[in-house]
Amino acid sequence: MAHLGAHFAFRSRWQKTDDELCRHSMSFILHKAIRNDFFQSYLYLLEKIPLVKLYALTSQVIDGEMQFYARAKLFYQEVPATEEGMMGNFIELSNPDIQASREFLRKFVGGPGRAGTGCALDCGSGIGRVSKHVLLPVFSSVELVDMMESFLLEAQSYLQVNEDKVESYHCYSLQEFTPHLGRYDVIWIQWVSGYLTDKDLLAFLSRCRDGLKENGVIILKDNVAREGCIFDLSDSSVTRDMDILRSLIRKSGLVVLGQEKQEGFPEQCVPVWMFALHSDRHS
């Protein structure tokens, strides 16, 4: 009986140890997956969201699709293909946004040593609000890329006046899209970088770098957190701070030519910044 009791005690003790090891192993696996996808941001995300929940919202793959992207796509299926929809119902911010974008673009386009005015690529274009008001007045041709087919279908009507200058529409998620090599004078990326993981944003910026012509520039315009990284559960996006963004830019082989804060937005809004980037091979 004493031997039997010792046997059960031994088995019970090791069962507990096995449970601990399994639990810690699972935590390690989840942690590693998140760190792989959000290598610059994951510690900030884990401060706010428990590990298992964060994994389920981001890195978990269900039916072949990563949940960070699947949830964003579900969100945008409910967004109307209108200017109001593109602005998140803050349509009053559209005019100051357009004006600031035009002025920022002028600093880097036209003239010796600057980007040309041949072809621009509008990434995460939606219905083409930026193309219509910022890019088409400047460039001979514009291409649009967005993951939502409904937005691109509406863009064909929305941009009808300039349809002869719209070269093509690409229905792709940006993590799956590769710009044509050496094709673009300007690649415009606005309010969409937060829908890419750190890993995929780094890779996408690198591919955009390769898509630039000589003296071409990337314009990155997005919300910038005051500190750390903020995860928006409603639309499955992240807002990165300046240090995280600049680190990803640097690692992608790009350098910052200039940056400027968007003015004219309410103080309660998350700050919006514009960055002009080009290949570090031209530095």
From Swiss-Prot:
Superkingdom to which the source organism belongs: Eukaryota
UniProt entry tagged with the keyword Methyltransferase: yes
GO molecular function, one term: N-terminal protein N-methyltransferase activity
An annotated GO BP: N-terminal protein amino acid methylation
InterPro entries in the record: MeTrfase_NTM1, SAM-dependent_MTases_sf
Binding site for S-adenosyl-L-methionine: 124, 129, 146, 174-175, 190
Reaction(s) this enzyme catalyzes, per UniProt: N-terminal L-alanyl-L-prolyl-L-lysyl-[protein] + S-adenosyl-L-methionine = N-terminal N-methyl-L-alanyl-L-prolyl-L-lysyl-[protein] + S-adenosyl-L-homocysteine + H(+); N-terminal L-prolyl-L-prolyl-L-lysyl-[protein] + S-adenosyl-L-methionine = N-terminal N-methyl-L-prolyl-L-prolyl-L-lysyl-[protein] + S-adenosyl-L-homocysteine + H(+); N-terminal L-seryl-L-prolyl-L-lysyl-[protein] + S-adenosyl-L-methionine = N-terminal N-methyl-L-seryl-L-prolyl-L-lysyl-[protein] + S-adenosyl-L-homocysteine + H(+)
EC number, as in UniProt: 2.1.1.299
Enzyme class of the recorded protein, top EC level: transferase
Gene3D superfamilies for this protein: Vaccinia Virus protein VP39
Keyword annotations of the record: Methyltransferase, Nucleus, S-adenosyl-L-methionine, Transferase
PANTHER family to which the protein is assigned, alphabetical: AD-003 - RELATED, N-TERMINAL XAA-PRO-LYS N-METHYLTRANSFERASE 2
UniProt family annotation: Belongs to the methyltransferase superfamily. NTM1 family.
Protein name in the entry: N-terminal Xaa-Pro-Lys N-methyltransferase 2
